[in-house]
Amino acid sequence: MFRAQQNAFDDAVAKATDENLTSENWEYILDVCDKVAAEESGAKDAVAAMIKRLAHRNANVQLYTLELANALAQNCGPKIHRELASRSFTDALLRLANDRNTHQQVKPKILERMQEWAQMFANNPDFGIMEQAYMKLKTQNPNLQPPSKPGKREITEADRQKEEEELQMALALSIREKPSAAPEPKAEPSTSASVPASQTQAATSQAVPPGTSAATVSRVRALFDFQPSEPGELQFRKGDIIAVLESVYKDWWKGSLRGQTGIFPLNYVEKLPDPTVEELQREAQMEAEVFGQIKNVEKLLTLLSTRSSELNVQDNEEITALYHSTLSIRPKLIELIGKYSQKKDEFTQLNEKFIKARRDYESLLEASMSHPAQPQYGRPGQTPYGYPGPAAPLGYPQGPPQSDPQRYFSPRPQDQTHMYPPTSHSPDPRGRTPPAGPSFPQHQQPPPDSYQPVHHRPESTYDNPQELGTSVYDSPVEHPSSSQRLPYPPSGAPVPPGVHQQFQHQQQEYPPSGYPPEDASKPPTAGFASQPPQQTLQQPPYPTAPVAHQPPPSHQPPPVPSTASKPTPYPSLTPGTPSGGEYQAYNPSQAGAANSNPNSYYR
């Protein structure tokens, strides 16, 4: 006579946990969440409706009910937490888990959800019933455990080669079977309570099939929640789509999810096949339908906003038709929102990775440019003051000069006051010859024609003093600024006082030298006879630092010349007088003209 009052959530919960669903329908689940949050007694009525669905004998219904309860716990706050931690709901879970007719995939799911809820409610002591029920279930069923994580084993070269062979074999089989492949008949939905359809599919693809490598799989779907226990592992929840990056261990792959990168076990995920051409066309058609209804939605909004509040909407056929036509695109719109939200997240992550890679590249490029590689052949190193440069071994005359780009180099402007003839040791990198004493012990000189240089500079505009016989290298290249150097008078002419004072001032800056400065504007008045290389090697370049293999001079160096005693800067010889092996004077035909025949210098 009296009928029980019908629960307002029975239809919504039954729709969200329908046994004919192939997977969780999040549109229906979110509708239940919104309804629970909107009504005062929504949490109590929703839990009562879920208790009824847990008593259903279909495993799909039981699994969908557990998923709905978890979604309510995540979205509806303390009200639903109190109802989930009630004695009636926990007893219903324990009865289902202890029933021997319950499917084997439902029992681990009950234990997994109760563990999550116990951890979620741990901060509130009023919800301790859930933790007690979880500990009771764990004690009564010690074998109920979530899938264990496989051990991490490094992939050997043989394993990689085997994966490659299996990949090639699978590709060959797919190419061979493609022409004869026939469309498979669609499977009718089963209403039996034995094995759920979604869990059957998950069981077949729970472990990634053998022969499948990270190179052939781009995406996987999580079958269970995974909490990392070690650094470097990727955390995910059931239903997450993970992008596969590479294969790291035997049963672990590396993937990316929500901007995080890490490894995950293969038995927690299932392979997602790449979309086919038909699926892509179907998605494009669905998007076209949604965008085609934009005008109707805007028109409906305009009509509703301009009409008066006294208008009866039910009597207006235009508004009713527009409403029903636009209502059909809501599920498609929600699906597209989820799809493009995921794509947006992926593009955002890709942009962040690109920015990081660009910054790393620019920093490395800047570091390499700030420290350029030194050239293999550069300027010769500077010889320390007081030590001679490298010279030829004793007893061997130096050969003809080679085409060396460093033979001639210009002195720096501040060092162009004096130019000294080159000696057998390497020139100073700063463009000047190391200073030497005014005189050294002279050995017996051979005849002038015993050793003649083989190279000269006939193309020179100025008659520079020719080189000594100690080296066959040409004179350093002169610069136009050489006109600033100190002139010297011809042989026998007195030295002007100003010039002598300037020369004395320069002698204070440099140690006294046995060679006079030269003038680019005047020809030399005396030449120097050639000397064998070994003669120069016997005299130290610096009087204060003798070379180790040379004996030091037996006498003290002469004093610095002063105004009282004016030493002759170079030997003065009368033309036509035989030199007797000492120095041979050379007089040009014209004092101020350039030497037209440089070969006449050596005679």
UniProtKB/Swiss-Prot annotation:
Residue numbers spanned by region Disordered: 140-164, 177-212, 371-603
Biased composition (Pro residues): 487-497, 540-561
Example of a GO cellular component annotation carried by this entry: ESCRT-0 complex
Keyword Membrane appears in the UniProt entry: yes
Domain UIM: 162-181
Stored Pfam families: GAT, SH3_1, VHS
VHS domain residues: 16-145
Main localisation: membrane
Keyword Protein transport attributed: yes
GO-annotated molecular function: phosphatidylinositol binding; ubiquitin binding
CDD domains: GAT_Hse1, SH3_GRB2_like_C, VHS_HSE1
Low complexity bias (residue ranges): 180-210, 374-397, 498-508
Biased composition regions of type Basic and acidic residues, renumbered to the chain: 151-163
Subcellular location: Endosome membrane
Keywords per UniProt: Endosome, Membrane, Protein transport, SH3 domain, Transport
Cysteines paired by S-S bonds: none
Membrane topology: Peripheral membrane protein
Polar residues bias: start-end ranges: 461-473, 586-603
Protein family according to the UniProt entry: Belongs to the STAM family.
Subunit structure: Component of the ESCRT-0 complex composed of HSE1 and VPS27.
Protein name: Class E vacuolar protein-sorting machinery protein hse1
Organism: Neosartorya fischeri (strain ATCC 1020 / DSM 3700 / CBS 544.65 / FGSC A1164 / JCM 1740 / NRRL 181 / WB 181) (Aspergillus fischerianus)
